[in-house]
Amino acid sequence: MSDESAREVDKQLRLRVCVLSELQKTERDYVGTLEFLVSAFLHRMNQCAAAKVDKNVTEETVKMLFSNIEEILIVHKEFLKVVEECLYPEPSAQQEVGACFLHFKDKFRIYDEYCSNHEKAQKLLLELNKIRTIRTFLLNCMLLGGRKNTDVPLEGYLVTPIQRICKYPLLLKELLKRTPRRHSDYTAVMEALQAMKAVCSNINEAKRQMEKLEVLEEWQAHIEGWEGSNITDTCTEMLMCGVLMKISSGNIQERVFFLFDNLLVYCKRKHRRLKNSKASTDGYRYVFRGRINTEVMEVENVDDGTADFHSSGHIVVNGWKIHNTAKNKWFVCMAKSPEEKHEWFEAILKERERRKGLKLGMEQDTWVMISEQGEKLYKMMCKQGNLIKDRKRKLTTFPKCFLGSEFVSWLLEIGEIHRPEEGVHLGQALLENGIIHHVTDKHQFKPEQMLYRFRYDDGTFYPRSEMQDVISKGVRLYCRLHSLFTPVVRDKDYHLRTYKSVVMANKLIDWLIAQGDCRTREEAMIFAVGLCDNGFMHHVLEKSEFKDEPLLFRFFADEEMEGSNMKHRLMKHDLKVVENVIAKSLLIKSNEGSYGFGLEDKNKVPIIKLVEKGSNAEMAGMEVGKKIFAINGDLVFLRPFPEVDCFLKSCLNSRKPLRVLVSTKPRETVKIPDSADGLGFQIRGFGPSVVHAVGRGTVAAAAGLHPGQCIIKVNGINVSKETHASVIAHVTACRKYKRPMKQDSIQWVYDSLESAQEDIQKSHSKPPGDGAGDAFECKVEDVIDKFNTMAIIDGKKEHVSLTVDNVHLEYGVVYEYDSTAGTKCNVVEKMVEPKGFFSLTAKILEALAKSDEHFVQNCTSLNSLNEVIATDLQSKFTSMCSERIEHVCHRISSYGRFSRVLKNRAWPTFKQAKPKISPLHSSDFCPTNCHVNVMEVSYPKTSTSLGSAFGVQLDSRKHNSHDKENKSVEPGKLSPMVYIQHTITTMAAPSGLSLGHKDGHGLQYLLKEEDLETQDIYHKLLGKLQTALKEVEMSVCQIDDLLSSITYSPKLERKTTECVTPMDSDNEKGERNSKRVCFNVAGDEQEDSGHDTVSNRDSYSDCNSNRNSIASFTSICSSQCSSYFHSDEMDSGDELPISVRISHDKQDKIHTCLEQLFSQIDSIINLLKGQAVIRAFEQTKYLTPGRGLQEFQQEMEAKLSCPRRLRLHLKQDPWNLPSSIQALAQSIRKHAEEVKCRILLALLEYSDSETQLRRDMVFCQSLVATVCAFSEQLMAALNQMFDNSKENEMETCEASRRWLDQIANAGVLFHFQSLLSPNLKDEQAMLEDTLVALFDLEKVSFFFKPSEEDPLVANVPLTYQVEGSRQALKVYFYMDSYHFEQLPQRLKNGGGFKIHPVLFSQALESMEGYCYRDNISVEEFQAQINTASLEKVKQYNQKLRAFYLDKSNSPPNTTSKAAYIDKLMKPLNALDELYRLITSFIRSKRIAACVNTPCSASGVGLLSVSSELCDRLGACHIIMCSSGVHRCTLSVTLEQTITLARSHGLPPRYIMQAMDVMRKQGARVQNTAKNLGVRDRTPQSAPRLYKLCEPPPPVGEE
């Protein structure tokens, strides 16, 4: 034998030893796995089934899951024993194993049963995993067995036997390959290979698995120079392969890439130069070049045209980056086409989601299970008494700890575990999950004499959502650090190099301690390490963990935005724009099992194919050919069409109204064909004219004309500035007949509810035949023309062409990003103009005008003061009153005029910011630039939304969140999705600047706080007095009616009433149980309970009862009557009643009436003695020098001592009781009227015309914005899309219902955020105006009513009505029955709730050194506002706590009640840290001595923290600046980005990048376009967080 042959044989024999070693090792592992399955799962489940602990775990269930696994274990124990005997003491080249397989080939047939049952077992396990108790039980089995459950789930263990039986042919094939033909084992191995193939072939499942593995093995055989473990060890299938260009180390090379589950391999194609070469005979096709485990692989998109460090300056097209995080190596791949790039990304996403989805869910389940088990064990150990106690160790006492050995022994004792090693596994799991820890944190769990402590006992236990808590704190910290006027994060020169946006580790720890975030340096370091672990920051050179040393660390988010000479800078765009949207929202109700439209798939996008004539879809504005973006929050344009169809069917089955986002254009041309039935629309107004109404099913509706559209051109001629008559002339120019005869049959759809109501009233009030009289009136708002003219085509034109501008457009952007949980998140950001904006303002003005009218009517009683006013002052009094009342009347007429104008205003649909102040106009009562910023987030529903902060970043645009086109949708089933809507309203701060003021101040400066309160007190007192006097009048009337029936004859009663006396039996009964008195009550009075007067005296109902004063009334009357009847003084001519008997119920009736009257009079007396009356007399004493408070009170005391006087009347002269009561009522009325007049006089003095007008103006602005903001959040909750905190592990439907219950009981919190700079005069005045406006808002209440079923206005889910006065304004929300039924019962029954506005104000620049007034600094002014608001937030929080702790609102079961309350209280318990931060911010502004210390460096951090605080309490958010444009845009974008990072898994590293994209490309760009003349007043010194992210300057210009 030649040397070369000998060397080859030696090599083969060495490899044979390797194969034998692998066979032995893997067989041992396999037997261990089987033993684990049997001991950890099978035995425990059998015990559970026998004990019947859970109805879902039965003997049949266990048998189905594990089949004959115990028999397989027995066989393989024998097989392993035989193999080890053959390979004893260790594998060598000459040993033989082929005979082992041949001996066991028949016994391996046992796998047939197991493999045939496997599919059923997997389905059963899938169902069992949906049951929480079973899932927890299985996790516990895994834990006690000592396995890391998130590495391999139970599903993986159950498939192991099939994988093993399929592995034998591959091992034997490799062994045969390495066994020389002359070897004694060669024949046996060959026969064993054939035998094992036969075994696998007879098992279907095993055959499929084996075929897959053979394909992979064959593929690997074609790779030359393969490195690492075999492909079949870690992978089961190839997902994608193709040729890509690879750029690394400056070289561009063509490489063949193969993507498997768990592995990416890239090779060089092998070129065959000679046909008969060795390579050809070996069959090598590729040369191995590298492999990356997908677990440590990140993929990042590269925009076309990019040339950066990783591409070595080469321009990248259709490319992406791959980062091997294990080796920290990068390379760039380029595909040949965008389609190929998309396919690769789709495959990568699919592989990642498959691998990570289950693992993340199991991590979350494990955390929940271990937390609950730890809590249970802790309580049991505490009850035990001698396990947890103070223990001494080396002269040190460790409180509340236990020994590891005692813990394991105790677990065995109570039956929690069956073997000591299970106790060790459980203890280690408790330690790893933060439930227990070693007292000095030096050891893992050991069953020895080591001390451990539950973290509950030393305050180091973190709540269940620990990951989310770190994310929330990290986002909060990042925002605070970047909100400072003196930055902590800044550029730093270090070792001859400048590092951008860095912070020293030890300085960050100093700052955290100074701010109070951490108490010790150790605690601060643990927090900072957590931030590094969760992807917030890292060492600038990736060379160190976080330590309390002068090391430089940078936030990833800063790195993303810094230019990019950074070596490890990641991708530029993670939050990617998928689509820009110009659309309108339609509301479509189902009707008779149909929505009235059909869709078709055109270019993979749902397009409206047909719209049924006269249907709800046509009424809403559906047009054929339009693209649909979203339905009920679901982005259907990203779904495959079969899924869209399935989604619509599910909506129809649930009878849900559809909220459809359909594409449109700002300006469209509508061609309306002539029709004998008319054109079918109405127009109104001019400059431009507006489509007032469209008939359902008419040609106009079919052509796509909608109410509210503005007519710009008619038949190509511009009529935007023409008169109404001119527009009509243009429309009717080609028509021969003026009007059709069939107008009454058309069902009109109007542009607003007011227009509809007005039109209906006109049509009802119009006499017959008067059809053409009102078409051309001079007032714009009254001009309506119904010209459904009959069309006879003249051959010239077959249609009327209208170019119209659409209204209520929604400008939006659809984004996508890959969340930390590994799911694709879609975000729709829209900026919406509120609907019903101007009409709501009009209704508020009408309510204010009615309130003024009522005030003027009351003022007519002022003349009654003439008798107490001095003669020489009467003329002054009269002129003052008439002058003030004239001002109020002028205001009433102005409000009426403004209301009419606003009701008919149609264009533009919002109020723009004015660059200059203009004279008073109706629009001054509307909020400026009021927009609702809507952000809708949707993503697949998984068991958890958390995950690593390092995610895959994809750029597969709109179809990468779904499977490929050929993916089939199971009929009737869709993967569940999460839909959440967040809303923030923006506006210019309420302002009355159009009225001007000589000092330039606002209302809070002009109106003293005590004056504001006094006016309120006066108005409330006035209302109470009026109500109380009415009640007195009603009580007196009742008593008069009762007493007037005395001495009436029963005969007369029978004549005058139908049923006057009771039946005979009742008479007899009454006679037996009655006393003889002087009163006879008519029968119809007996039906009256005496309580029919609704009393509203809650403010003065604390007076003492007067029942004692009339307790003996019956006996008094009886005795007095008796003496009267038998008196000699009785005139013989006096006629006595025939029946003078009265029953007990009639006596009780009189008792009740008198008691009620006495209580009412006492209440009025208490009111007349109150502080408000004293203040009113003090204010008006200059007009009545002869009659002051003392005289009034003396006179009142003399005349109104009612209980004593009336008791005297009853004893002495009961027959004169009616006159006494009348006299008493007149006296009380006289005194009350005098007080009323004085109050009215005082109010007239307060009623400065200009000040009240300004107050109404800012109140209207704030109330309109408040109603619009609440409406959007209310609809989100009713549509089950509201969720203010995803970290509470609550379904959106439950979170929505909880919020509705919350507002129904505690009211709704409104968070107003002011970005105004009070150092500027005009913005200071706006802030002062806003404070008064919010003071008035506290008097507003919200109520709800169902609307009419058949709406006259399309796409308006809510309409409003306003009633009441300035002191108690009620806003009624009318909604359709579907949404109304979802309201809490209290609201459906007519109950309402108050609104709780709070204002947090912080300028975006330092206010240090600016003075406000009276030696008060601007900083102190802001601090006062914020302190008061924080106190109100705390009060609201207390209301919520009280509501949640109310036993009546929780489940009846004690256990579930505790869990329910804990679930509700969790978000509230997390607020303490936010309270502390805001308090420290406010305090730091106030302490002048600390200006230069770290504790004062809060910057504008108050804004984001106060917003988070209110958001956690379910508040509605309104952000204000001077114009509602620039600063509002910055703040809204920041808040939305924070929400995405905190609640929806946006990787923290992309916070700044996401803000930059949303600011520069988002929906609010349109707001700037709509306000081109408005100056940007954002301070230049604003912190970085509130500045637009600018690109870095070129190199050399820094």
Swiss-Prot record:
The DH domain, residue ranges: 15-206
Residue runs in coiled coils: none
Chain ranges of the DEP domain: 382-456, 483-558
One example GO MF annotation: GTPase activator activity
PH domain ranges (all copies): 237-353
Swiss-Prot/TrEMBL domain comment: PH domain confers substrate specificity and recognition. Able to discriminate between RAC1, RHOA, and CDC42.
Protein name: Phosphatidylinositol 3,4,5-trisphosphate-dependent Rac exchanger 2 protein
Biological source species: Mus musculus (Mouse)
Lineage of origin: Eukaryota, Metazoa, Chordata, Craniata, Vertebrata
GN (gene name): Prex2
